[in-house]
Design a protein with these regions (language model features):
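Short coil/turn connectors at secondary-structure junctions
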Residues: 19, 46-50, 88-94, 116-122, ...
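Active-site-proximal loop->helix
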Residues: 108-113, 133-145, 165
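Conserved thiamine diphosphate
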Residues: 140-191
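Thiamine diphosphate
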Residues: 54-132
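Short, hinge-like loop/turn segments at secondary-structure boundaries
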Residues: 69-70, 114, 139-143, 192, ...
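Glycine-rich beta-alpha junction loops
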Residues: 56-58, 128-130, 181, 204-210, ...
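Active-site diphosphate/adenylate-binding microenvironment
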Residues: 5-74
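Flexible, low-complexity linker and terminal segments
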Residues: 1-9, 17-19, 206-298
Length: 298
């Protein structure tokens, strides 16, 4: 009896014409993308209304590898670009998928204010602790004491704790998983996609060519063993207590899961108070182009 062929769960969402990809062997970004496509399949979202926005960096190439409406934007500007998409068409499910350097360093200001405003975005950040595409330089996420080309004697700056940053700025969903914990990561991404508001998922990922090699952390398999042995699942943990120390244990789990009005909800409330029945949201005006244009011209 011939066995049935088994493809990737998200095969229809991946662009095989873009192979081979740019990611190094043992890099975790492919695993993060795989989890994302499976989460999308499980979410039952209308894929014609899903948009993926990425910035610059290794993770930023995700936008070019998916069979979705996707946008590869300038460095650090993925979130403001995504915010514009969402405000122009509130019916879209907009996902920002990028790396720690793009989202938290170059785009840190945008990250803070999007979370503060509670813009209805799903933000997935692959954190590999360095600027991998440009040579592994120190980043705001590099743990204290870790070695990089720009800190050859060890990093002397304190690093950001991304869950603490997202939660303190107002995110309604905050989680951290690793590229080893794929089942939990898929479920977390699926939950984030279903949330209304700024939903943030951090994905801890190896950078075998630069960060792990320079810090003598072994092979990709060694990194997986480290994630198995040095991670603690603590759902509901205070985000202020989940900092990552070089060589220390890593707390993972879902830390924040709340509901509150989104930026669009607040806009609607304000405009209805000012204009009453004269206010009609652009996505509720029908598909007739002239009708939409008339609303924009008012």
């Amino acid at each position: 009896m011939n066995a049935e062929p088994h493809g990737h769960p998200g095969e229809a969402l991946l662009r095989s014409d873009r192979q081979p990809h740019i990611w190094c062997p043992e890099c975790g970004i492919g695993t993060a993308l795989s989890c994302f496509t499976e989460a999308l399949v499980r979410s039952k979202l209308d894929l014609d209304k899903v948009a993926v926005v990425s910035g610059i960096g290794c993770t930023g190439r995700v936008a070019g590898y998916v069979h979705l409406d996707s946008f590869h934007t300038t460095h650090g500007r993925a979130i403001p670009f995504a915010t514009g998409l969402k405000l122009a068409n509130p019916l879209l499910k907009v996902v920002v998928f990028s790396g720690d350097g793009d989202l938290i360093s170059i785009g840190g200001n945008h990250f803070i204010h999007a979370a503060r405003r509670n813009v209805d975005l799903t933000v997935i950040c692959v954190n590999n602790f360095n600027y991998a595409m440009t040579g592994g330089q120190v980043a705001p996420t590099t743990p204290l004491g870790a070695v990089s080309p720009t800190t050859p004697y060890g990093t002397f700056e304190n690093s950001f704790s991304l869950p603490a940053l997202a939660a303190s700025c107002g995110a309604v969903y905050v989680a951290r998983w690793t590229t080893l914990h794929v089942r939990q990561l898929i479920r977390s991404m699926e939950t984030a996609l279903a949330k209304r508001g700024f939903a943030f998922v951090e994905v801890i990922s190896p950078c075998p060519t630069l960060y792990t090699r320079r810090n003598k952390l072994g092979s990709g398999l060694d990194w997986m063993r480290m994630l198995r042995d040095k991670t603690d699942v603590k759902n509901g943990a205070d985000p202020r207590t989940v900092d990552i120390d070089f060589g220390g244990r890593i707390t993972i789990g879902t830390f924040v899961d709340i509901e509150k009005p989104t930026l669009q909800d607040k806009i609607d409330e304000s405009m209805k108070a000012a204009l009453g029945e004269a206010y009609t949201r652009i996505d509720q005006a029908g598909t007739d182009r002239s009708e939409r244009r008339a609303l924009l011209d008012q």
